[in-house]
């Protein structure tokens, strides 16, 4: 099935490309989402008229992503985690945790846009990539630190008064 892309589609093509895809992918995803249209002569002519409007829209999205990239690059996240002996983490730091921490800083990003090869399992500073647009990838510094160690032994223990026998 030949289609004209109306937007940049990851791993497929850019705005205006004529691509060949399997019929199911075209009918069930690209066409209903408005990401493509059938590649006929009439549609090619109509698309050329619409291309400037779509290109301006894509440029606006790219500019907004670049601005957000600068904001993310200036942000350093500090994520406190529970650790055991030898500073070994309980669990790991995932994209969901990083996304929630970014949301607390006022940057709302879908966790699927945060690119981690594997979950973070060590303390320290880690560079995490965030794909904001097909052309814009921001780098975020995530500092994983140990939570304040609050132990139960530090709390004063109150001894119970001995009970008096019942009469």
Swiss-Prot record:
An annotated GO cellular component: ribonucleoprotein complex
Keywords: Ribonucleoprotein, Ribosomal protein, RNA-binding, rRNA-binding
Biological process annotations from GO: translation
Pfam families xrefs: Ribosomal_L9_C (PF03948), Ribosomal_L9_N (PF01281)
GO molecular function, one term: rRNA binding
Domain of life: Bacteria
Family matches, as PROSITE patterns: RIBOSOMAL_L9
InterPro entries per the UniProt record, alphabetical: Ribosomal_bL9, Ribosomal_bL9/RNase_H1_N, Ribosomal_bL9_bac/chp, Ribosomal_bL9_C, Ribosomal_bL9_C_sf, Ribosomal_bL9_N, Ribosomal_bL9_N_sf
Described function: Binds to the 23S rRNA.
PANTHER family named in the record: 50S RIBOSOMAL PROTEIN L9 (PTHR21368)
Protein family according to the UniProt entry: Belongs to the bacterial ribosomal protein bL9 family.
Name of the protein in its database record: Large ribosomal subunit protein bL9
Species per Swiss-Prot/TrEMBL record: Nitratidesulfovibrio vulgaris (strain DSM 19637 / Miyazaki F) (Desulfovibrio vulgaris)
């Amino acid at each position: 099935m030949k289609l004209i892309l109306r937007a940049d589609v990851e791993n497929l093509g850019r705005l205006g490309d004529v691509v060949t895809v399997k019929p199911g992918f075209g009918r069930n995803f690209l066409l209903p989402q408005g990401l493509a249209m059938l590649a006929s002569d009439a549609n090619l002519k109509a698309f050329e008229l619409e291309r400037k409007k779509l290109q301006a829209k894509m440029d606006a999205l790219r500019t907004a992503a670049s601005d957000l990239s600068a904001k993310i690059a200036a942000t350093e996240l500090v994520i406190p985690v529970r650790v055991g002996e030898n500073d070994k983490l309980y669990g790991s730091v995932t994209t969901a945790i990083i996304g929630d921490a970014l949301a607390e800083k006022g940057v709302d990003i879908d966790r699927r846009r945060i690119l981690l090869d594997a979950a973070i399992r060590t303390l320290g500073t880690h560079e995490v990539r965030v794909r904001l647009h097909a052309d814009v990838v921001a780098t975020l510094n995530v500092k994983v630190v140990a939570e304040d160690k609050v132990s139960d032994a530090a709390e004063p223990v109150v001894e119970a008064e001995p009970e008096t026998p019942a009469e």
